Amino acid sequence: MIPFLDLKPAADAADVHAAINRVIARGWFVLGPELETFETEFAAACQAPHAVGVGTGTDALALALRGLGVGPGDEVITAPLSAAYSALAIMMIGARPVFADIDPDRLTLDAAAAAAAVTSRTKAIMPVHLYGQPADMPAIMAVADRHNLLVVEDCCQAHLATCAGRPVGSFGAAAAYSFYPTKNLGALGDGGAITTGDANLAAHLKRLRNGGQTDRYHHAEFGVNSRLDEIQAAVLRARLRWLPRWTSERRALSAEYRRRLKGAPVTVPAEHDPGHVYHLFPILSPERAALQAHLKARGVETLIHYPVPITRQPALAPERPADCPVADRICADVLSLPLHPGLTRQAVEEVAAALDAFHAPA
């Protein structure tokens, strides 16, 4: 069996265990030195002046928007192809997600579609760097600048990615990251962070994540309880040192998939930027259900990211669904192949051979 993912600590196991034991021995579990140091180290890795650790990637998105003044009555333009949490984050602060279709090659927010979705109520654009593929940030920033809009980048699947030679997260006013265990930089539970170049925003976010407190038991504003705990921060510090190596592995394995699948009757989304970090490796097939069943029978585990566009989710798009035909088509055809650090080239060859067998003449 070739698993889709393997989340057990492997090469990093000794570092992870040492990090956990260090926190337990210290006896300080929330808002302590591990978080403070991780924030400094993660900011440096992202080439950002400031990082603020929070409880989840969803909270990171919601707090970034809220910290920038987005709230009830405002509209935020985002992509319909994503995990639903991107839209949930907008709704959590009382704003309204407005969906603009995706670029059929990048599979990320299309700048022209975003421009067409701007109204007098639009306050921000939230592009999602999906699957590790950077959105077209120069084009999106041009739309934002033309309409005087904020930009918050959803980098939850794009740790260390770059676009046009710049780190993702460096284009907008703030960026949100997730450390959910499946992410390129994953914790042993939930976690998230916000990066920004604005010192005042960073200080504000640190208050918001801790109940709006300016001092212990002194709540100056309405905040939330969303803190990246010390054990997760310590684990992330340990794994951050492995992230460049893991990113190189993902890129090498993806290049092998691309080489091996060249000419196969499936569509492999284009790599528009060498800064792609391959959180996932999706392919497109109009025969997805049959292909997935065939791969399962051959011992290859696959998943679908994502089977339903956010515009078709009743809880998240209660009004008339936006017209996003590209996202609809991608959701009908997309299938994610196994990809993770530790996956071997032999496994990639076996996956490709299984794909060949599906398409071989009877």
Named regions from a protein language model:
Residues 1-28, 33, 338:
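N-terminal "arm"/small-domain region of PLP-dependent enzymes with the aminotransferase-like
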Residues 35-41, 45-51, 112, 124-128, ...:
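PLP-dependent aminotransferase class I/II
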Residues 52, 77, 98, 151-152, ...:
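Structural detector of well-ordered beta-strand residues that form the stable sheet scaffold
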Residues 28-75, 86-93, 99-101, 166:
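Phosphate-binding glycine-rich loop
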Residues 53, 78, 99, 194, ...:
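Conserved SAM-binding loop
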Residues 89-90, 143, 167, 184, ...:
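Hydrophobic/aromatic ligand-binding patch that stacks against planar heteroaromatic rings
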Residues 66-155, 162:
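PLP-dependent aminotransferase-like
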Residues 153-188, 215-220:
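Conserved active-site segment immediately N-terminal to the catalytic lysine
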